[in-house]
């Protein structure tokens, strides 16, 4: 008796379904790709309960004949390829003949189809891969496939499913990618009777992008184009100012097929160069037309992994196309728009009134074009400069660079009349104007400063500057070279981090609400996770298609950072499934410290340079900037003697060798 048997076809299809049909979105992908291959110009996707109860795809394509219909449920039966040579010039999205049999084996499937050559169509009903009904019916040209009770006979896969909202988000993402890949097809996605996505099918990629990401996003996207003998690259990329926190908005299409490719993603980022902020990614839709002989799509059942010949040449084409397109643009953002962070609103915004709520945090002074920290009563009595570097001597006539905010700036522009306030530095925390809470904060600050004073950071004696970029100082361990930008970036980062670390849970009403647009999948995911945003004081309400409205904002989020701040918090939530004010404010501190620090080629007077080194010595970590770059390097006396060959590697003196 033999131990090896040939598996029944239904069982083999169920095994194949484990690879092909991972979730309801996989079914939508396979059925829609079949509809596209059938030369459809209109495709409607209807789902119930995120596809677990029902998925229905209707198209106006070529349809199937009565004879071909039962063959479509046979494994490896396909009309896409006929011979081995066809495998190397595939231009259709499907070709394996696995998708439909796999789907049918784990669901109840109903197919209605008709071709334009016949007067009647056909109906097929199958459950678990077994055909129950096959008969002639009257139906329009095209195909309608309904999949019901998905995974009913594979409970392990059904148990693996995430929430309905998460599965719906995957379906929306699949339809969006296919819409971008085929703008000539009009797509409609309906979930539980509600329309989520609709594209016009005009063939205009830019119009398809507007239908998915919104008109405001599309306005900030640039067309790119490049070609050689093997590849044609075209598409749209966002301006450097329009970015997201993850790569999910980067869409790469090869011959109308959405693919994932790490090297091509890197080529896109290389095209932007240093124009992108660290950790930010552009919105990109790139269409690559390639000879099928140079692309092997027969790698994985999902066909999202494609091996491309001459990949390095293609990477260079993409990078060049993006960089050349950006060169032709004025990348300086609109000053008022950048200041107000109000790119998502379609109307002029009157000045917001401030509620009489006491808070501390970062504010922006448009007259001084600088940020300042608005303090409570503590700061009005004890200036911050007393704690960090002592009072600043403004009598120096040469150009000076502000290392930390002056005491006048600390209390804000509305309090400039308080310039005569006491400048005394109290050595004790028992001050009559300090309440218990502020005494504790001040005590903690003094304790921290005392500990910082005991740091092992070397005592440095400044003596010069090179190229307006590097400071030179000497200490007992030799020569120290300090990057002045990195040094002040560290100083300002720790300053801002402390000042914005605490937040107020109060809310302030907005006179004019903000509108926030998201892609369909992000919109659905955010609805599911809205409770987490509510916990940090962000209350978004659904307002139209893929749009939220914000009617009030948390006090810890200042007026000028509402638009960017809400988007940042939403991106953080989508990326990490959690939202943290602390993380957001830390990132804000890094950004502000970089923008407000001394730049290269900026000469410092001796006083400012020495003051910067004093403040650097008081930092918790004076050795690296917030981005991780070194702040200073050291040449010991022995290193210098080696470089000038005053000593040999074996430490034998040149004098001892009789050469000095």
Curated annotation (Swiss-Prot):
Q: Which family does it belong to?
A: Belongs to the DNA mismatch repair MutL/HexB family.
Q: What name goes with this protein?
A: DNA mismatch repair protein MutL
Where does this protein come from, organism-wise? Streptococcus pyogenes serotype M1
Q: Record keywords: DNA damage included?
A: yes
What are the top taxonomic ranks of the organism? Bacteria, Bacillati, Bacillota, Bacilli, Lactobacillales
Supply the PROSITE patterns for this chain: DNA_MISMATCH_REPAIR_1
| Entry-linked HAMAP family | DNA_mis_repair (MF_00149)
Per UniProt, the keywords (alphabetical) are: DNA damage, DNA repair
Under PANTHER family, the record lists:
DNA MISMATCH REPAIR PROTEIN MLH, PMS, MUTL (PTHR10073), DNA MISMATCH REPAIR PROTEIN MLH1 (PTHR10073:SF12)
Q: Which gene encodes it?
A: mutL
Entry-linked InterPro entries: DNA_mismatch_repair_CS, DNA_mismatch_repair_MutL, DNA_mismatch_S5_2-like, HATPase_C_sf, MutL/Mlh/PMS, MutL/Mlh/Pms-like, MutL_C, MutL_C_dimsub
Alphabetically, the GO molecular function entries are: ATP binding; ATP hydrolysis activity; ATP-dependent DNA damage sensor activity; mismatched DNA binding
Any Gene Ontology CC annotation: mismatch repair complex
What superkingdom does the record give? Bacteria
Q: Which GO terms describe its biological process?
A: mismatch repair
Question: Does the entry annotate any disulfide bonds, and if so which pairs?
Answer: none
Q: What functional role does this protein have?
A: This protein is involved in the repair of mismatches in DNA. It is required for dam-dependent methyl-directed DNA mismatch repair. May act as a 'molecular matchmaker', a protein that promotes the formation of a stable complex between two or more DNA-binding proteins in an ATP-dependent manner without itself being part of a final effector complex.
């Amino acid at each position: 008796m033999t131990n090896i048997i040939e598996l029944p076809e239904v069982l083999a299809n169920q095994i194949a379904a484990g690879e092909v049909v991972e979730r309801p979105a996989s079914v939508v992908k396979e059925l829609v790709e079949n509809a596209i291959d059938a030369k459809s110009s209109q495709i409607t996707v209807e789902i119930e309960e995120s596809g677990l109860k029902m998925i229905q795809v209707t198209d106006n394509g070529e349809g199937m004949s009565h004879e071909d219909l039962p063959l479509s449920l046979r494994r490896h039966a396909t009309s896409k390829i006929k011979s081995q040579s066809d495998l190397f010039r595939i231009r259709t999205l499907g070709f394996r003949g696995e998708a439909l049999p796999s789907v049918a084996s784990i669901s109840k499937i109903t197919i209605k189809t008709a071709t334009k050559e016949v007067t009647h169509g056909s109906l097929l009903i199958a459950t678990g891969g077994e055909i129950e009904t096959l008969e002639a019916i009257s139906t329009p040209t095209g195909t309608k496939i309904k999949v019901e009770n998905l995974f009913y006979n594979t409970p392990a896969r059904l148990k693996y499913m995430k929430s309905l909202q998460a599965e719906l988000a995957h379906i929306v993402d699949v339809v969006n990618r296919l819409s971008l890949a085929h703008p000539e097809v009009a797509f409609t996605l309906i979930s539980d009777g509600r329309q989520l996505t609709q594209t016009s099918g005009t063939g205009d990629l830019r119009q398809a992008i507007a239908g998915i990401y919104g008109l405001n996003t599309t306005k900030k996207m640039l067309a790119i184009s490049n070609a050689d003998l093997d590849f044609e690259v075209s598409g749209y990329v966002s301006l450097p100012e329009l970015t997201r926190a993850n790569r999910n908005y980067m869409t790469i299409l090869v011959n109308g097929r959405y693919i994932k490719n790490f090297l091509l993603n890197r080529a896109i980022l290389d095209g932007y160069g240093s124009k992108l902020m660290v950790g930010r990614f552009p919105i990109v839709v790139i269409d690559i037309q390639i000879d099928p002989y140079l692309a092997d799509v027969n790698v994985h059942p999902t066909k999202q992994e494609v091996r491309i010949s001459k990949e390095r040449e293609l990477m260079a084409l993409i990078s060049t196309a993006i960089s050349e397109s950006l060169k032709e643009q004025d990348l300086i953002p609109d000053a008022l728009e950048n200041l107000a962070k109000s790119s998502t609103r379609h109307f002029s915004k009157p000045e917001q009134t401030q509620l009489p709520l006491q808070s501390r945090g970062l504010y922006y002074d448009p007259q001084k074009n600088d940020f300042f920290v608005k303090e409570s009563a503590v700061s009005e009595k004890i200036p911050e400069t007393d704690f960090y570097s002592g009072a600043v001597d403004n009598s120096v006539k040469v150009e000076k660079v502000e290392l930390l905010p002056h005491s006048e700036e600390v209390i804000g522009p509305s309090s400039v009349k308080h310039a005569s306030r006491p400048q005394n530095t109290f050595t004790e925390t028992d001050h009559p104007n300090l309440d218990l809470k502020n005494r504790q904060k001040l005590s903690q600050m003094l304790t921290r400063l005392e500990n910082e004073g005991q740091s092992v950071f070397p005592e440095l004696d400044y003596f010069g500057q090179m190229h307006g970029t590097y400071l030179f100082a000497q200490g007992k361990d030799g020569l120290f070279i300090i990057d002045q930008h990195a040094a002040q970036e560290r100083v300002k980062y720790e300053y801002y981090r402390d000042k914005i670390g605490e937040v107020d849970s109060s809310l302030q009403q907005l006179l004019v609400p903000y509108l926030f647009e998201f892609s369909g999948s992000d919109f659905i995911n955010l609805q599911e996770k809205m409770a987490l945003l509510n916990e940090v004081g962000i209350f978004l309400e659904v307002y139209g298609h893929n749009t939220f409205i914000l009617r009030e904002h948390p006090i810890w989020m200042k007026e000028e950072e509402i638009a960017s701040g809400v988007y940042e918090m939403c991106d953080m939530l989508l990326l990490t499934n959690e939202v943290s004010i602390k993380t957001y404010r830390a990132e804000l501190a890094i950004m502000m410290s970089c923008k407000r620090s001394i730049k290269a080629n900026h000469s410092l007077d001796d006083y400012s340079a020495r003051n910067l080194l004093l403040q650097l010595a008081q930092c918790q970590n004076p050795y690296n900037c917030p981005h991780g770059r070194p702040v200073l390097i050291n040449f010991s006396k022995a290193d210098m003697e080696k470089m000038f060959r005053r000593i040999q590697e074996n430490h034998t003196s040149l004098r001892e060798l009789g050469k000095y």
